[in-house]
Each structure stands twice: as C-alpha cells, then as structure tokens.
C-alpha cells in the first residue's frame, strides 16, 4: 500500500499539468509579480481541432483554461488587453501598468484560434538589435510571443557555433572559419548567402555565448507550447573548402548589395 501511495505521489508531482501550470505562474511572476496570485491556470483536454482558451472569474481569482500553455498565455493576454487595458511590449525595459484591483468577468468566455500554425520572425529581424540581446531580452520577447499566440517562432540564434564545429572537423583553421562569418549585425545576410567576411573575424567568445543563449531560447519556447523553427543546411560553404577539396563543385555566389568582390564565397 505504501509503495502504491509513493508511486501516486511521484506521478502527480511529475505530471504535465503541474509543469504547465508552473510555467504560466512563472510568466506572471516575471510580468506582474504583485498580481501573480490572482490567476489560476488549468489545462483542458486537447480534444478539439483548434487551440482555445476560456476565461472566468471564480472566488476572486481569474481562472484561465486552455488546451496547452500557448493557449493559456494567449488567454492571459486577452484578459490583460481587453479587461485590464494593459499593454505588454516585447522590450524587457518597458514597465507593465496593471490596475490595483483586477476586473471581474460577469460571464465565462471561450475563444478559438483561427489557424493552427502561427509563425513569427524572419531572417533579417535577427540582424537589428537581436545580435546584442541578453537572456532577459529574449525572455521578454518569448513571453510576448506566447501572449500573442505565436507557436512557430523562427529560432536561428547561435547557428554559427555549429557551423564552426563542422568546418573545423572538415579541416579548416580557426581563423579561416571565423573570418568567413560576418560581424554579428550582418549575420542574417551571411546566412542567406549574400555576404561573407564583412566585419570579421567573429569572436570565439561570441560564438560560445550564442550557443548557450540558443539553448535557453528553444527550451523556453517549447515550455510555452511553441515549436521552434530551426535552420538547416542551405548549401552555403566557405571558399576555403576548395583548398581541402579541390575536386568539389563549389560555385561562387554573385555580388550582392554593392559589396566588393572579396566579400563573397
């Protein structure tokens, strides 16, 4: 009997429902800790085709139900926007203004998502301010994405750390690889095969930091019900590979954006 009871306790403690609710409570603590205790979150059976959330007032608390964490976060934002008249921006430094007393819902509401896949970001957005973001900046953007129903975010941070390992394993030297990459602000265009070598070499410390940051990013996105869209191999390789593989059919890219001849592979 004791053995069965122990198994039940362990099973409950490790259940997805508990983990999902913890994720939403943590989000509330990040955004408005003074009101975190006024919200409860419940995972509903995921038996319907589209994502959905339900909001209702129960015993002086705002109860939000949904079929996954992404739906719960979207429901939370619906309440913040249309009942509290509160705006949550994606900038970590922007203050979130909350009412002293949370508005009560007279009736329960249920809202369904209009589409299954909700994509966000593109390659160029990773070249504006993102190259210099810390985890706190990404943490806020990921919260914002979840609040706004994004469930398939582009996640390409830190991919150069992987390519560095690949090119090194194939025989290229450290300086050759890091010089092939552009500086941080131009990496999106390097990733799209537009330009190489510009403002290089890329520091090894930056590569290591971005690798660590990407792991944090995708872990949090998955926790909040998202499926990160990761990069694959586009066929773009360093020109220096020709030295190691002289018989390989490597085609030089055309010039782009007025950059000099030397900034292309």
Name every feature range the model reports, one short phrase each.
Residues 35, 42-49, 54-65, 69-70, ...:
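Aromatic-lined carbohydrate-binding surfaces of glycoside hydrolases
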Residues 20-23, 137:
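Short amphipathic alpha-helical segments
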Residues 1-21:
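Bacterial Sec-dependent N-terminal signal peptides
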Residues 24-36:
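Mature N-terminal segment immediately following signal peptide/propeptide cleavage
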Residues 86-90:
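Conserved short beta-strand edge segments in small beta-sheet-based binding/regulatory domains
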Residues 97-101:
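Compact, glycine/acidic-enriched structural inserts
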